[in-house]
């Protein structure tokens, strides 16, 4: 790659994916005036298979595989991901090199009739495709009915507006980025529902030997966000977490101290194992591993073993 070669960003075509790609393009050009950046749009399996729960068709990796192949084949230089959708491991030659500043990590309660979860009537129908959200919702409100909800943000809102659901749960960050914050009736605090690993953060994946690009991306990395998200991801990697299992995790920085909370649960909310750990931010990844092992020893191992057996 020469100094004048345009940077090519591989991106899905959904409005949120395009927002993220343009966000990185703008940030690169702000940091390096005159730099040429192009978007290379593509369709992934996750965009096409909309009639089956993610957990049953390969999980979140469905949204990134085509982008990774494009980078490995030299058709694109980097890919921009919502961190909550990034699998725990990467193909050889690629890596997560930059994590941008985190947006709101909370879940959002969206409804045309009700203001919050407490207002939902007995047996209300709530839409989500996330086992993590389902698990925590069902623990709090065992009476509600969870109904599968797939598609991009606009599609999901359309299904709510068509009367298929009493409420739906979406990531607050996505709604804010798409200027749809007015659809949020209330925010669900982490104390009530822990977010997904990396929720609200945008990450950049590229070839790890592309020295010119690594240098260009340096100003986009947000250290506080990266420390928090890498702590959460270390926990998730140790649990071998994926789409098939309800795992929530959220790290906060308080000065140089990092505070990590996490949970593993049954999809129906009948059992949830929770834990937390605090320590110095420089030990964030070790703390993530420590908490994962504590969760495993406290009952999470049995939950995970059962869930993975059910999917085999």
From Swiss-Prot:
<dbReference type="Pfam" id="PF03900">
    <property type="entry name" value="Porphobil_deamC"/>
</dbReference>
<dbReference type="GO" id="GO:0005737">
    <property type="term" value="C:cytoplasm"/>
</dbReference>
<dbReference type="InterPro" id="IPR000860">
    <property type="entry name" value="HemC"/>
</dbReference>
<dbReference type="GO" id="GO:0006782">
    <property type="term" value="P:protoporphyrinogen IX biosynthetic process"/>
</dbReference>
<dbReference type="InterPro" id="IPR022419">
    <property type="entry name" value="Porphobilin_deaminase_cofac_BS"/>
</dbReference>
<comment type="subunit">
    <text>Monomer.</text>
</comment>
<protein>
    <recommendedName>
        <fullName>Porphobilinogen deaminase</fullName>
        <ecNumber>2.5.1.61</ecNumber>
    </recommendedName>
</protein>
<comment type="pathway">
    <text>Porphyrin-containing compound metabolism; protoporphyrin-IX biosynthesis; coproporphyrinogen-III from 5-aminolevulinate: step 2/4.</text>
</comment>
<dbReference type="InterPro" id="IPR022418">
    <property type="entry name" value="Porphobilinogen_deaminase_C"/>
</dbReference>
<comment type="function">
    <text>Tetrapolymerization of the monopyrrole PBG into the hydroxymethylbilane pre-uroporphyrinogen in several discrete steps.</text>
</comment>
<dbReference type="InterPro" id="IPR036803">
    <property type="entry name" value="Porphobilinogen_deaminase_C_sf"/>
</dbReference>
<dbReference type="InterPro" id="IPR022417">
    <property type="entry name" value="Porphobilin_deaminase_N"/>
</dbReference>
<feature type="modified residue" description="S-(dipyrrolylmethanemethyl)cysteine">
    <location>
        <position position="243"/>
    </location>
</feature>
<keyword id="KW-0808">Transferase</keyword>
<comment type="similarity">
    <text>Belongs to the HMBS family.</text>
</comment>
<keyword id="KW-0627">Porphyrin biosynthesis</keyword>
<dbReference type="Pfam" id="PF01379">
    <property type="entry name" value="Porphobil_deam"/>
</dbReference>
<dbReference type="GO" id="GO:0004418">
    <property type="term" value="F:hydroxymethylbilane synthase activity"/>
</dbReference>
